[in-house]
Amino acid sequence: MTKTLAGPAVAALLAAVAMPVAAQTTTLRIQNHNAPESTTGRLIAEFVENVETMSGGDIDVEMFYSASVVKSAETFDAAASGILDCDMTNGSYQTGKNPAFQFVADTMGGYDTPVQFHAWVSHGGGHEMIDDLYNAQGMTLVGNHVGGQESLNSTRPLAGAADLQDFKFRSPPGMESEIFANLGASPIVMDFTEIFTALETGIIDGADASTLANNVGLGIYDIAKHTTYPGFHSMSADHLACRTDVWEAMPEAHRAILTAAEKALALDLMTLTEVENGEALVTKLPELGVTVYDWSTEDRAAFREAAQTAWNDWATRTPETEAIVQSHRDFLQRIGLSE
């Protein structure tokens, strides 16, 4: 005898089948070290909007600017330990863990343009090398972003290498401090967010902060009336890196959205920095009374020589540093920037 489902049972079954499955949501607490009004800060705000729009609201990003939760250099560990979920600062802050972290962000005297650095990341094995380094710390690399060569800023003339003698300036931790110390300067390592106050109070004569455009946004040229341009000494790439268990728990679609939004941020930062650097050079810096110094070929060569000496030294410190330095050298040769 064939039994049929009663009307209420059929209705209940059909309702269950038709009921949409609730979308998985992702909530991320991310810290960066940029001021909201800076070039990078404004583009990070667009990154947040893009992520939330592309996910239909299923990814909720709580973004903290200007290292408002922990100090800039502590962001990576804060994400790894669960205070935050992701880090949007700079890998070179972590050179104390392994000197190889210097070369995930700023080769100093290596690449000339952001495109060349991104080419190494995307097509020279860079992403995999960085990710391996981060995985050992419980973090996963999503992507990198960099605007362009940075400018040194000073409250005193900075026309060439000779002016570096006894020049007290803010430096990030890592290889840069050693290079400039060898050139006669007195680098002082301090948090990115402390630069303005240190300049204002005279603790430092100048700073290595960021690009012309970002420096304008940070208000540095309200105090420091001397700067170098075009930049030559540093092109430091920030990153988006998330705690590995958080990253792996996300739906694949959410990981794809974050990766795509980070790539869009990287492209926008390169192009907007080009525009805003030019605007700063032509209009804003003259209005602020800033003197711009284009270092001679000889002075730039002196810096590059000091940087390459530092590369050789740092490459001996750990196997990971040796490998990543060699990777950069191989890629520089591959794209015709070195012999």
Regions found by a protein language model. Name each.
Residues 4-5, 22, 26:
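Absolute N-terminal positional cue centered near the fourth residue
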Residues 10, 24-117, 125-339:
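N-terminal secretory/targeting leader peptides
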Residues 18-20:
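N-terminal signal peptide c-region/cleavage motif recognized by signal peptidases
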